[in-house]
């Protein structure tokens, strides 16, 4: 018998193994931090009964609710998989671990493509990582615990009779299998590269499958379980200067910066994303750069282990399942020559414009049910075509005005989720591990945006007393506002100071003119909603105002701003941007696209602050105006 557990926000769930052979125990608790002390609900199910309806609660999304289309959004995140199939895969890798025990010490073998349509990273599948059982005994899953329901994945902890725990990552089926296949293949290869070549501590991956044809019946990654605490536990962005927790604050900045330093330490030979070289046997060789991923490798086991292929950066794949992959997407995904760094920006713009055009065509043909105003899509086309048009001129790649320009343009590994929430410090050795590499790609450091946990685009305040006139005479409310700006400025400054300590040749990437030049591209990469194309326009219009100065200083390629905006264009943009800001301010939970953490949602619903409508949507009850 196996037992499985649905834990809440808790990163760790410790439960005893069931002694009832052939069944699994399921434990479900509330999905929030404040409720993790609640006694979990336990359900037993037979290992061989994949159709047991009692399992469904284990696979359902529970960490939040949506104000609109709640049922549909949760159904998109239903992660049912075959527990029996998982058990078979664990037995397979256990057999492989015994075979690997005979391999020469230090030998790094290539990934093995198994007959069951999974891939094993056999260099990680060794007895010390997998564990041991008695002779003639079979590997048995004893407990399954759902420990995290993130934006893109459901994370399960798998306890076994090997005296080892594993992590099973199941991506939500938010996109088609082709998208998930590229994403998983690249992420696994990138983590392997980070481990073996860059010396970054990552959870060891043992096995993965890129579609639902494997025994798990879902795309999956099976990897090492790291016992520990998230680095986020020590991060307080609003800490007072000189606080007793200053050392923790400084350590978080240091740990994340050290990871970044290792990620960008090696100059690569193309822009795109990393894959295993033996992925070539099942793919189109034109997808991959033929030359070595980097120069100077002397270890024969690492030579030709990886290749650069199409970029899996999220913005290039998000909401594009309706496009013809080979005709409408592939031409814009790279890989790109290291001689053409601005092609990344150009192709991002062209792909998004193609996406908007296709959506308009589908809507006009009556084959799309999405509720989107045609004007918004038409405006997106104009915006993204402008981004593609200006891309070759955004940076003068031969300028001497920006120190170390060629260093800034070289392909380097970029991690999109470099964040203390994505770093775990293991319990025993207190070593930091970088967890999730989804969407990692190689691109110039000059186009890499700052980590979100320290990013700040507001007014900069470096000293409250010097920068703010009569600060001491302000009201408490005004002081709090300025203190917030100061602390956000301080956080970003501390991050950039650490970047200068670790990588002084790259520090000019955070110079204000350079940030402004890349801002249209960053706005495109970070766009979350349909209306946020306006933020790209805003960045382009800001560039228009200073373009002459940049041209005089040899920062850009063209003396004249490459785009044309009429007075009416600018007035319409100002009006639309104002409406967007008003919408963000007036619409509850607009920043999370209507998603609410489940404990907060339950409290608001029970108090009457949220009201369910007849169509299943929810509205936030506005407070009555005082007389």
UniProtKB/Swiss-Prot annotation:
Q: Which residues cross the membrane?
A: none
Transit peptide stretch = 1-43
Superkingdom field: Eukaryota
Cystine residue pairs: none
Alphabetical GO CC annotations of the entry are: mitochondrion
Q: What does the UniProt entry say about where the protein is found?
A: Mitochondrion
Q: Which InterPro entries match?
A: Kinase-like_dom_sf, Mito_inheritance_9
SUPFAM superfamilies per record = Protein kinase-like (PK-like)
Q: Which UniProt keywords apply?
A: Mitochondrion, Transit peptide
Q: Reply yes or no: does the keyword S-adenosyl-L-methionine apply.
A: no
Give the signal sequence positions: none
Similarity-based family: Belongs to the AIM9 family.
Name of the protein: Altered inheritance of mitochondria protein 9, mitochondrial
| Source species | Saccharomyces cerevisiae (strain RM11-1a) (Baker's yeast)
Lineage from the top down? Eukaryota, Fungi, Dikarya, Ascomycota, Saccharomycotina
């Amino acid at each position: 018998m196996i037992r499985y557990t649905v834990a809440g926000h808790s990163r760790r769930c410790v439960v005893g193994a069931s002694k009832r052979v052939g069944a699994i125990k399921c434990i479900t608790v509330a999905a929030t931090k404040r409720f993790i002390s609640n006694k979990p609900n336990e359900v037993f199910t037979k290992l061989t009964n994949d159709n047991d309806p009692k399992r469904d609660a284990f696979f359902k999304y529970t960490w939040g609710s949506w104000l609109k289309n709640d049922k549909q959004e949760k159904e998109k995140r239903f992660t049912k998989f075959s527990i029996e199939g998982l058990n078979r895969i664990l037995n397979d890798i256990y057999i492989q671990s015994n075979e690997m025990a005979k391999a020469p010490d230090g030998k790094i073998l290539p990934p093995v493509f198994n007959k069951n349509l999974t891939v094993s990273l056999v260099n990680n599948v060794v007895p010390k990582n997998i564990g041991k059982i008695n002779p003639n005994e079979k590997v048995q899953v004893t407990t399954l615990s759902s420990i995290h329901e993130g934006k893109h994945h459901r994370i399960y902890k798998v306890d076994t009779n090997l005296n080892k725990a594993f992590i099973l990552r199941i991506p939500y089926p938010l996109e088609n299998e082709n998208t998930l296949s590229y994403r998983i293949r690249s992420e696994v290869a990138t983590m392997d590269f980070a481990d073996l070549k860059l010396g970054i501590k990552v959870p060891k991956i043992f096995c993965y499958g890129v579609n639902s044809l494997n025994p798990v019946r879902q795309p999956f990654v099976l990897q090492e379980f790291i016992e520990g605490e998230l680095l986020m536990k020590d991060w307080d962005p609003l800490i007072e200067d000189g606080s007793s927790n200053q050392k923790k604050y400084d350590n978080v900045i240091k740990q994340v910066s050290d990871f970044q330093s290792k990620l960008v330490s090696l100059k690569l030979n193309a822009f795109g994303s990393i894959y295993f070289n033996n992925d070539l046997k099942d793919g189109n060789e034109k997808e991959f750069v033929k030359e070595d991923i980097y120069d100077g490798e002397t270890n024969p086991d690492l030579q030709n282990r990886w290749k650069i292929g199409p970029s899996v950066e999220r913005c290039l794949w998000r909401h594009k399942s309706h496009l013809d992959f080979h005709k409408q997407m592939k031409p814009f995904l790279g890989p790109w020559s290291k001689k053409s760094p601005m092609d990344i920006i150009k192709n991002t713009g062209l792909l998004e414009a193609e996406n908007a055009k296709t959506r308009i065509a589908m809507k006009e043909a009556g084959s799309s049910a999405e509720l989107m105003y045609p004007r918004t899509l038409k405006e997106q086309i104009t915006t993204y075509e402008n981004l593609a048009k200006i891309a070759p001129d955004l940076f003068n790649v031969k300028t001497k005005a920006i120190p170390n320009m060629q260093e800034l343009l070289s392909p380097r590994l970029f991690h999109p989720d470099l964040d203390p929430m994505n770093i775990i410090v293991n319990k025993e050795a207190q070593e930091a591990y970088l967890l999730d590499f989804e969407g990692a790609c190689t691109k110039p450091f000059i186009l890499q945006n700052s980590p979100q946990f320290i990013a700040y685009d507001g007014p900069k305040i470096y000293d409250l007393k010097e920068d703010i006139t009569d600060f001491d005479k302000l009201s408490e409310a005004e002081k709090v506002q300025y203190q917030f700006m100061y602390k956000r400025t301080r956080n970003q400054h501390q991050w950039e100071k650490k970047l200068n300590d670790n990588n002084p040749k790259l520090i000019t990437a955070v110079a204000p003119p350079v940030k402004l030049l890349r801002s249209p591209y960053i706005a495109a990469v970070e766009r979350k909603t349909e209306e946020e194309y306006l933020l790209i326009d805003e960045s382009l219009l800001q560039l228009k105002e200073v373009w002459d100065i940049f041209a005089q200083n040899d920062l850009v390629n063209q003396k004249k701003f490459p785009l044309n905006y009429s007075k009416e264009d600018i007035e319409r943009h100002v009006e639309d941007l104002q409406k967007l800001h008003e919408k963000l301010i007036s619409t509850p939970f607009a920043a999370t696209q209507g998603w609410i953490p489940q404990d907060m949602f339950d409290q608001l619903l029970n108090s009457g602050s949220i009201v369910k409508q007849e169509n299943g949507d929810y509205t936030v009850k506005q407070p009555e105006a005082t007389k």
